[in-house]
């Protein structure tokens, strides 16, 4: 398949490119533009990279073109051989080793005829395999001469595929000249020793040499334009294309493999990236939106607090602190009225039930009651206070009976007074709670109104900023789609949240994060990956190899892909002569030696070698036959019949019963001539 080539306008001067490509004449500049440059950035993964996009690495691989070039060189070299040259090299080899049929038979005269034929076949197979290896080494050197035009050369196949994937067309610059490929080929053919040692190689190189030099000149004279240093113009009125190198001013031609569509104001290319562009931009915008949401709304609020031990939490911890403050902890073992009173207050704070009041007060009175009630009174029975006697005993009995009653009355009075105080305090608390509840209701209403106003203001600001960003992106991409204009991202502020009122002695905040909604794009990425894979596989006719479990093992060019893309590369881009028939998809995955064997079997050289081998084996078998018996003894043995003698005559003898002319002399002379 040969793709159409554009016609370069030649009606104007070479240096008048700007005037030539004026919009008044119907010319528009289609490359470079923001859209076409973005296409190449997509191929480089600037807007994201998916698993399906990895198929493109196989598409732009030069493996298929390398195999096509190798097959062309192998075919040309092997088909340039002649029977005469092969026979001359074979006879020279036989003479050099002393393997003529007669000598071979004399050397193995005691062996059977079949064994001698096997030796002859083995001798020829050795020479044939050596010749094939020698020719392969020579052909490998020929292929290496075309390395400057390989994947990294000016006429590289990957650049050709890049242009097709982005725009569906290829700009080509031609300048007929001898470059590195031609010079390397000439030096190789001149200096290689095989051209002086083997007639087969020398004559084949001489016959195929002109074709090799034309192919090398095609590589040297062709340059696929670089994507970022070429201008492409299109005349939608005449359908013409113009290619110009802005650095050197050189003009070229444009190979249009997939014609684009002119919509009246712009050109829509028929290419894989053009078809995938809306989905790529949409998925990229979604990822950017999720990233902005993460930066804007996920500001971390870090609050680091120390956690108290179990022995220092609650009422017990407060009592321990008070003991330390008053200097009356377990270490000092001291006590005072102030410390006992503070402990009473702390114990009353930790009460959970009304019945705990009696226990709390009782423990306090047990601790301090001896100082308040059981203080020793003045003993009147002592000397100096009157008579002791019986009065002393009776006084002691009265005090012993009145002490428990007094202590119980004191406790009851203290408990009643505390209950009264607590009841009044609780009533005051209920009143305060009601007033605070009414105040909180009013504040909550005001807070809701402020929140609504804040949300409206935030939504309006975001909408204005989004509209401005969309307009900037459209101006950058030329209307092809949205793209980040390079604006600074919104700076996320840290939010301060006061949670102190919601914490008690048993809770603390180690770290806190806000978790707002962030859109998920995993499904969109998976869908885009499948789109990439389907588009590349179907557009470039890539063949997927799978095992018995259905798992993909490898992917390669199919026969259809070679005919659709590799053949136009040699015919329309390089304009290479006599490349030969396109290889098949199964040939692409072969190695160099495997491809050589496959080509070797299809050329005339294989037929010539088979014929020479058959003749050599036949000569050896003929030389191994025993000599025929001498006819002299049969003519003169006693009792020989005339019929037996007549059989040994030449084909020109007379018929049976005719008179013998010349007798046995002529017969003997004939036999002597036959022996000679």
From Swiss-Prot:
Query: What GO biological process terms does the UniProt entry carry, in alphabetical order?
Result: chromosome organization
Q: Which GO terms describe its cellular component?
A: host cell nucleus; virion component
Pfam families noted in UniProt: Herpes_UL6
Q: Where in the cell is it found?
A: Virion; Host nucleus
Q: Where is this region: Putative leucine zipper motif?
A: 422-443
Q: What does this protein do?
A: Forms a portal in the viral capsid through which viral DNA is translocated during DNA packaging. Assembles as a dodecamer at a single fivefold axe of the T=16 icosahedric capsid. Binds to the molecular motor that translocates the viral DNA, termed terminase.
The highest taxon in the source lineage is Viruses
Origin species, per record, is Human herpesvirus 1 (strain 17) (HHV-1)
Give me the ranges of the annotated region Disordered. Answer: 383-404, 627-676
What name does this protein carry? Portal protein
The question of whether Disulfide bond is a record keyword is answered with yes
- Record gene name: UL6
What quaternary arrangement does the UniProt entry report?
Answer: Homododecamerizes. Interacts with terminase subunits TRM1 and TRM3.
Alphabetical UniProt keywords? Disulfide bond, Host nucleus, Viral genome packaging, Viral release from host cell, Virion
Q: Where is the composition biased (Basic and acidic residues)?
A: 666-676
The similarity comment for this entry is:
Belongs to the herpesviridae portal protein family.
């Amino acid at each position: 398949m040969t793709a159409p080539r554009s016609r370069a306008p030649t009606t104007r001067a070479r240096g008048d490119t700007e005037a030539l490509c004026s919009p008044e004449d119907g010319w528009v500049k289609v490359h470079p533009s923001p859209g076409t440059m973005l296409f190449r950035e997509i191929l480089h993964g600037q807007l994201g990279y998916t698993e399906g996009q990895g198929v493109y690495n196989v598409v732009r691989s030069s493996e298929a073109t390398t195999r096509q070039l190798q097959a062309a060189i192998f075919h040309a070299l092997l088909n340039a051989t002649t029977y005469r040259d092969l026979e001359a090299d074979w006879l020279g080899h036989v003479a050099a080793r002393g393997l003529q049929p007669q000598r071979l038979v004399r050397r193995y005269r005691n062996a059977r005829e079949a064994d001698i034929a096997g030796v002859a076949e083995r001798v020829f197979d050795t020479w044939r395999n050596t010749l094939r290896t020698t020719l392969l080494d020579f052909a490998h050197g020929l292929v290496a001469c075309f390395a400057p035009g390989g994947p990294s050369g000016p006429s590289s196949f990957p650049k050709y595929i890049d242009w097709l994937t982005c725009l569906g067309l290829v700009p080509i610059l031609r300048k007929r000249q001898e470059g590195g490929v031609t010079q390397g080929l000439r030096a190789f053919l001149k200096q290689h020793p095989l051209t002086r040692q083997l007639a087969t190689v020398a004559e084949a190189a001489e016959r195929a040499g002109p074709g090799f030099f034309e192919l090398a000149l095609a590589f040297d004279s062709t340059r696929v334009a670089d994507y970022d240093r070429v201008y492409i113009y299109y005349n939608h009125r005449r359908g013409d294309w113009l290619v110009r190198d802005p650095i050197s001013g050189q003009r070229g031609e444009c190979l249009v493999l997939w014609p684009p569509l002119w919509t009246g104001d712009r050109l829509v290319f028929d290419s894989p990236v053009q078809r995938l562009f809306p989905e790529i931009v949409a998925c990229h915008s979604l990822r950017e939106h999720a990233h902005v949401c993460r930066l804007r709304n996920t500001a971390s609020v870090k609050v680091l607090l120390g956690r108290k031990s179990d022995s220092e939490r609650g009422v017990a911890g407060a009592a321990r602190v008070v003991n330390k403050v008053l200097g009356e902890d377990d270490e000092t073992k001291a006590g005072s009225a102030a410390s006992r009173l503070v402990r009473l207050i702390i114990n009353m704070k930790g009460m959970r039930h009304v019945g705990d009041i009696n226990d709390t007060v009782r423990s306090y009175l047990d601790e301090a009651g001896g100082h308040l009630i059981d203080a020793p009174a003045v003993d009147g029975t002592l000397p100096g206070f009157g008579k002791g006697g019986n009065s002393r005993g009776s006084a002691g009995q009265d005090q012993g009976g009145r002490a428990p009653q007094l202590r119980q009355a004191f406790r009851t009075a203290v408990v009643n007074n505390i209950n009264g105080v607590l009841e009044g305090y609780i009533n005051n608390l209920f009143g305060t709670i009601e007033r605070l509840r009414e105040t909180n209701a009013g504040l909550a209403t005001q807070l809701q109104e402020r929140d609504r106003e804040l949300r409206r203001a935030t939504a309006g600001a975001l909408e204005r900023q989004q509209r401005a960003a969309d307009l900037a992106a459209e101006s950058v991409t030329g209307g092809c789609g949205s793209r980040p204009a390079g604006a600074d991202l919104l700076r996320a502020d840290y939010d301060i949240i006061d949670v102190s009122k919601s914490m008690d002695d048993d809770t603390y905040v180690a770290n806190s994060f806000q978790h707002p909604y962030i859109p998920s794009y995993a499904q969109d990425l998976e869908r885009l990956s499948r789109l990439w894979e389907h588009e590349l596989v179907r557009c470039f006719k890539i063949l997927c190899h799978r095992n018995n479990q259905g798992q993909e093992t490898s992917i390669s060019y199919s026969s259809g892909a070679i005919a659709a893309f590799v053949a136009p590369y040699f015919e329309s881009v390089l304009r290479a002569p006599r490349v030969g028939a396109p290889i098949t998809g199964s040939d692409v995955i072969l190695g160099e030696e495997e491809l050589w064997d496959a080509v070797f079997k299809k050329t005339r050289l294989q037929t010539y070698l088979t014929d020479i081998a058959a003749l050599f084996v036949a000569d050896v078998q003929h030389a191994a036959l025993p000599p025929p018996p001498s006819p002299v003894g049969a003519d003169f043995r006693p009792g020989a019949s005339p019929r037996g003698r007549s059989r040994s005559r030449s084909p020109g003898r007379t018929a049976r019963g005719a008179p013998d002319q010349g007798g046995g002399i002529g017969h003997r002379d004939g036999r002597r001539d036959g022996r000679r």
